[in-house]
Amino acid sequence: MVVAAAIREEIEIPEGVEVIINNNEVTVKGPNGEDSRKFTYPNVDITEVENNVVLETSFPRKKDKAMIGTTKAHISNMITGVTDGFEYHMKIVFAHFPMTVKVNKDVVVIDNFLGERHPRTAKVVGSAKVVVKGDEVTITGINKEHVGQTMANLEQATKIKGRDPRVFQDGIYLISKE
């Protein structure tokens, strides 16, 4: 089996975005803010060459090749986050008991879910911001993982156990990603 001597991937840095690389910690600054992340995989070298982020590895194994792709995706998501940001839209669905959703600092409180007396809570992760307008919930942020995990926390908080999901369709569901 022939093995490539090296793998090299490049990510172009757009106008108005600054990338700082310091000991495998990548910091991306852009018009929407700043995001940083430490990449600790030993066989992947991260450098900046002529307005490009370059990821390299020598004599790669399967895991090294996979980590190059993963690291490239993470850095691309960081660049997208500081330029455009991420926005997820969710819909509050209820049939009989009108639930109310409120945001208190870094916790989303769901009252009267299926007529329950105790409120359910969902954690807002990291730099994500949650806005509730009527029956729409909008989650925005520059870090894709924080926005996605906050969305998952909201969905899990309204998960119904022990009842037929075809009948009890109440909850907060994802309707679109931007």
Swiss-Prot record:
GO terms for biological process: cytoplasmic translation. Disulfide bonds: none annotated. GO terms for molecular function: rRNA binding; structural constituent of ribosome. It comes from the Archaea. Keywords: Ribonucleoprotein, Ribosomal protein, RNA-binding, rRNA-binding. SUPFAM superfamilies: Ribosomal protein L6 (SSF56053). PANTHER family: 60S RIBOSOMAL PROTEIN L9, 60S/50S RIBOSOMAL PROTEIN L6/L9. Belongs to the universal ribosomal protein uL6 family. This protein binds to the 23S rRNA, and is important in its secondary structure. It is located near the subunit interface in the base of the L7/L12 stalk, and near the tRNA binding site of the peptidyltransferase center. This is Large ribosomal subunit protein uL6.
